[in-house]
Amino acid sequence: MKQILLIDVSPRGKDSASRSVADTLAARLTSLYPSAKLIRRDLAAQPLPHLDEITLRALSTRDAAEAERLKETARQSDQLTDELLESDLLVIATPMWNFGIPSVLKAWIDLVVRPGRTFQYADGEVLGLAKDKKAILVLASGGVFTEGPWRPWDFIEPYLRQILNFIGIVDVQTVRIEGMNIPELVVDAVPKANKAVAELVL
């Protein structure tokens, strides 16, 4: 493994459960792969722009003259996409907000899920171009969404798995940090997740 890309999403800093467990995972990864380059991108500290008309044109135009004129606009997306494509492992550490992902993570996704770079259409089917990579999702939530009555409300893991599969990343493992807002569960939530990290196949 040559490069690991870790995406931190939570703005809670040291109080963030997803960041805490991501720290544990990062430590294990660097121990297993000491020569690997670890890129840790903090979307809370350095939020990315959401797509606007100019950015959409810059990323989708097929006109060479327009592409040249808008290349500076596309530069950040190019850098983020290169960062993903050059990585062997993608780690996304994020909280669940309102049953889905924070908008800063969606902004990153919108900048790296690009036709001709991370996916393409061939014979009426989608071909993911970010192949031969693995992903680990570290997902924190106030409630319990892997079982029980709230399970249908979990839109975060299905969405992330679907979008990763779309671009060719099909080997996806998940670590859940659940019950952060439930007094009887919060004490064990992070330790339980750290134990799950130790059991991941890396």
Swiss-Prot record:
InterPro entries: Flavodoxin_fold, Flavoprotein-like_sf, FMN-dep_NADH:Q_OxRdtase_AzoR1, NADH:quinone_OxRdtase_FMN_depd
PANTHER family cross-referenced by the UniProt entry: FMN-DEPENDENT NADH-AZOREDUCTASE 1 (PTHR43741), FMN-DEPENDENT NADH:QUINONE OXIDOREDUCTASE (PTHR43741:SF4)
The gene coding this protein: azoR
Protein name, as recorded: FMN-dependent NADH:quinone oxidoreductase
Keywords carried by this UniProt record: Flavoprotein, FMN, NAD, Oxidoreductase
Role according to the record: Quinone reductase that provides resistance to thiol-specific stress caused by electrophilic quinones. Also exhibits azoreductase activity. Catalyzes the reductive cleavage of the azo bond in aromatic azo compounds to the corresponding amines.
Subunit-structure text: Homodimer.
HAMAP family: Azoreductase_type1
Cofactor: FMN
EC number: 1.6.5.-, 1.7.1.17
Note on cofactor: Binds 1 FMN per subunit.
Any one GO MF annotation of this record: oxidoreductase activity, acting on NAD(P)H, quinone or similar compound as acceptor
Family per similarity comment: Belongs to the azoreductase type 1 family.
Catalytic activity: 2 a quinone + NADH + H(+) = 2 a 1,4-benzosemiquinone + NAD(+); N,N-dimethyl-1,4-phenylenediamine + anthranilate + 2 NAD(+) = 2-(4-dimethylaminophenyl)diazenylbenzoate + 2 NADH + 2 H(+)
Residues the record lists as binding FMN: 10, 16-18, 96-99
